[in-house]
A protein has these predicted regions:
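Right-handed parallel beta-helix
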Residues: 123-125, 160-173, 192-206, 223-239, ...
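Right-handed parallel beta-helix/beta-solenoid
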Residues: 32-78
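Bacterial Sec-dependent N-terminal signal peptides
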Residues: 15-39
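Glycine-rich repeat segments that build the extracellular carbohydrate-interaction surface of secreted
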Residues: 65-70, 85-103, 118-125
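Short glycine/acidic-rich loop motifs that flank beta-strands on beta-rich extracellular proteins
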Residues: 131-135, 173-179, 204-213, 237-244, ...
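Extracellular beta-strand-rich solenoid/capping regions of secreted or surface-exposed proteins
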Residues: 81, 85-86, 102-120, 128-165, ...
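Bacterial N-terminal signal peptides that target proteins for export
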Residues: 1-9
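Hydrophobic helical h-region of N-terminal Sec-dependent signal peptides
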Residues: 11-13
Length: 360
């Protein structure tokens, strides 16, 4: 019997008519591991928050490049690297069964895409890209000259537009260079980024430092809010923000799951077992999501740690659940021990709005 693509489950949840509202190093080498391990269903099956159009999956019916010719052996790491380097819409034809492809760090070029810097990677619910525990999986940086400068102010540009959807990432690890500050699986500095129906597991940002974060994903200076929709983050580890970390990024997280993510236990940082945010003038909006058994050490905040340096931000949580998140530090909200937010100049945990949400 053929295994069914898991992305169908997430799509049904997203488009449910019962939905409610919510605010808010490189190289082409590497081998292929054709293990038949299905990524599994993604997102929160109990999350029914309506997703704005900006957060919906990209249209991939007419791909720029298709990786593979219908069987697992044709889906090599070098083919994946070349397809993504070319930009545009990348899909996969690796046969009817789930396939894991172990890849080197894949670069997102600033001038890729169809003249607009767009890169969409759609795994069709059957593909896992793995770093093999040796390297990060995706790398986007508008200020990395090797990725081709496209403007005189690389820190302010809003391209490339990177979208990952219906795909899993596993066993990513930060490199020992200047980008080791975050993103065990995915690093995005500049441009824009969205994730729809993805799963990130067992990925690590392994260097201990106060602002270094994001075992799964790390973003820097995003000109538009990052949408994370119908996605699952499990077993990721970082200095702070076991799953997600960022500087200067607004997030819109819908119908997603964060489980068993953790911070490192020695050195600096260690805030936000699941999410760590820092920077100026941004908002973290969460709706229909589940946070369970995430752990933080040192500074604490078992699930979410947010500091907006200019005190012009907010943390908005709606229709979500927090269960079994823990920390060994003292920095946390008195009313919601797994959360800490300092987002406005109001006394206490200013900028925090929570509705229809349970804490256990």
């Amino acid at each position: 019997m053929q295994k069914k693509p898991w992305f169908i489950v997430g799509l049904v949840v997203c488009l449910s008519p019962l939905a409610g509202g919510c605010g808010g190093g490189s190289g082409a080498g590497g081998g292929m591991d054709a293990t038949q391990i299905p990524p599994g269903p993604n997102g929160n099956p109990d999350g029914h928050c309506a997703v704005p159009s900006a957060g919906l999956a990209a249209v991939t019916a007419s791909p720029t490049t298709v990786v593979g010719t219908g069987n697992a052996a044709s889906c090599t790491a070098s083919a994946v690297v070349a397809a993504i380097a070319g930009g545009g819409v990348v899909t996969f034809n690796c046969g009817p069964d789930p396939v894991t492809i172990t890849v080197p760090e894949i670069q997102i070029f600033n001038d890729g895409g169809l003249g607009d810097g767009s890169v969409t990677i759609d795994g069709g619910g059957l593909i896992t890209l793995s770093g093999g525990g040796a390297n990060r999986i995706l790398y986007q940086n508008t200020c990395d000259e090797s990725l081709h400068f496209t403007s005189s102010r690389c820190d302010l540009q809003n391209t490339p537009h990177l979208v990952v959807q219906n795909i899993a990432f596993a066993d990513g690890s930060t490199p020992g260079d200047a980008t080791a500050l975050g993103g065990g699986a995915i690093y995005v500095s500049g441009g824009t980024f969205n994730a729809f129906n993805i799963r990130v597991t067992n990925s690590t940002q392994s260097t201990s430092h106060g602002d270094w974060a994001g075992g799964a994903i790390y973003t820097v200076e995003q000109s538009q809010p990052v949408f994370v929709v119908n996605s699952t983050f499990d077993g990721n580890v970082a200095s702070s923000g076991g799953a997600l970390g960022s500087i200067g990024t607004s997030w819109s997280i819908y119908n997603s799951v964060f489980t068993n993510n953790a911070t490192l236990t020695a050195g600096d940082g260690h805030a936000g077992g699941a999410i760590y945010n820092d920077g100026n003038s941004y908002t973290l909006s969460i709706c229909g999501s589940d946070f369970e058994d995430n752990v933080a050490a040192s500074l604490g905040s078992g699930s979410i740690f947010e500091v907006v340096d200019d005190l012009k931000g907010a943390l908005v949580i709606d229709q979500s659940t927090f269960t079994g998140n823990s920390n060994t530090g003292s920095v946390q909200s008195s009313s919601h021990p797994s959360i800490y937010v300092e987002a406005t100049d109001k006394a206490g945990n200013g900028g925090l709005t929570i509705t229809a949400t349970t804490f256990n």
